[in-house]
A protein has these predicted regions:
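Glycine-rich, flexible loop segments associated with nucleotide phosphate handling
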Residues: 168-177, 222-227, 254-261, 353-358
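Aromatic-residue hotspot detector
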Residues: 39, 47, 75-77, 83, ...
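Tryptophan-centered motif/residue detector
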Residues: 14, 83, 271, 317-318, ...
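Non-catalytic, mostly N-terminal accessory regions of nucleic-acid modification and defense proteins
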Residues: 1-217, 287-298
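Mobile active-site "lid"/loop adjacent to the S-adenosyl-L-methionine
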Residues: 254, 314-358
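Glycine- and acidic
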Residues: 18-21, 165-166, 190-196, 227, ...
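Intrinsic-disorder/low-complexity loop/linker signature
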Residues: 62, 73, 166, 249-250, ...
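Conserved S-adenosyl-L-methionine
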Residues: 199-309, 314-329
Length: 358
């Protein structure tokens, strides 16, 4: 992606907060609107070309087949993605039909959100997006924000388009969208220093980790790789690992290697960012799970080729110990290891660390 275009796009999105959200949100809460709206606009843009096909599938399932619930296979086949939207609306049509009534716009916007498939509904809930659009409508800025995100002067779509002056704006690839999203996250993290350490690992640290893990095997990269991060945050470590392996301008250049990313994140908003980032980049979003890695194990029995992580060191996890130990007995097999005793016989050993390393 052209860096000048990338920087212009990030700057435009960043300016939306100052132009529309000042005095509506405190500065530290701008991200609560901007990040989910970026995700929403991108997903909306991806679905636009197949919108009519999805609406035809809606009629077929509802009127011809008399289905009481949507058949996901039919819907995703129509949308060409693992997600879909069954409403009549797009963000462009919401803006195009808007009047001065913020409440009418709010009602239409809610219908639009309700039309998304279950995997996107989860992201909407985690972002608390319905509450945000209601707040913006009540403050008379919802239309202003929508106008910015559908402006012809920025391109969050995967297609080349013309701006208001007739100049071509390049298409935004999935990789380019990932760069834009990660740059926005980085800027918001810098703005909110008190939160940065909770879900952000500096890019140079991730770069060092990927070198340490993958450099030694750069000449032995298999055709299929699985990578897991049990405290994945916004997914930066996962996506950077894949990029380090497959980048045609990188050291390894394993462009034909299929990389499958898996992660788990305990914070709802951070999980939503990670999962939506995977969607935006065309990865399988169902490989990202929400919850504590310590208390639940959605990947039980799964083996991964590599694991990279930067867990929240210094944070007590005493409240989750009950899921791992019952008194002195270890009840989670992940924390039992086989060790040989003095006579060379294998025995189960307790590998549970202290509940606080602070």
């Amino acid at each position: 992606m052209n860096h000048a275009v990338h920087n212009k796009l990030v700057s435009f999105i960043w300016s939306i907060a100052d132009d529309c959200l000042r005095d509506v949100y405190v500065r530290g809460k701008y991200r609560d609107v901007i990040l989910p709206m970026v995700v929403l606009r991108r997903l909306d843009a991806l679905l636009e070309p197949t919108k009519q096909h999805v609406l035809e599938e809606v009629v077929f399932q509802k009127e011809t087949m008399k289905f009481t619930e949507w058949d996901d296979k039919g819907m995703t086949a129509a949308s060409k993605y693992v997600f879909y939207n069954t409403s009549e609306w797009t963000l462009q049509s919401l803006h195009g039909s808007a009047t001065n009534s913020q409440q009418i716009l709010l009602g239409n916007f809610e219908d639009y959100l309700n039309g998304f498939s279950a995997n996107v509904q989860e992201i909407i809930e985690m972002f608390k997006l319905r509450a945000q659009i209601k707040h913006m409508a009540n403050k008379d800025v919802l239309l202003d924000v929508l106008e910015k995100f559908t402006s012809p002067d920025i391109n969050l779509t995967p297609f080349e388009k013309l701006d208001t002056a007739g100049r071509k704006i390049p298409a935004l690839t999935n990789l380019g969208m990932g760069y834009v999203f990660e740059e926005l996250i980085r800027k918001f993290n810098e703005e909110n220093n008190e939160e940065a350490g909770e879900h952000y690992t500096p890019r140079e640290v991730i770069d060092l980790m990927t070198h340490m893990v993958f450099d030694p095997i750069k000449d032995k990269i298999p055709s299929v790789i699985t990578i897991y991060d049990p405290a994945c945050g916004t997914g930066g470590m996962l996506t950077e690992s894949e990029l380090f392996i497959t980048d045609e301008e990188g050291k390894i250049k394993a462009t034909n290697t299929s990389v499958y990313l898996f992660g788990k994140e305990v914070n709802d908003e951070t999980y939503a960012i990670c999962k939506s980032d995977m969607m935006i980049k065309g990865k399988d979003p169902e490989h990202i799970k929400v919850g504590s890695t310590l208390s639940t194990d959605e990947f039980a029995g799964t083996k991964f080729d590599f694991m990279l992580s930067n867990p929240p060191y210094g944070k007590s996890w005493a409240s989750e110990q009950k899921y791992i130990k019952d008194g002195k007995d270890v009840i989670d097999n992940r924390f039992l290891i086989k060790l040989k005793n003095y006579w060379g016989e294998e025995e189960d050993a307790d590998a549970v660390p202290r509940s606080s390393d602070g």
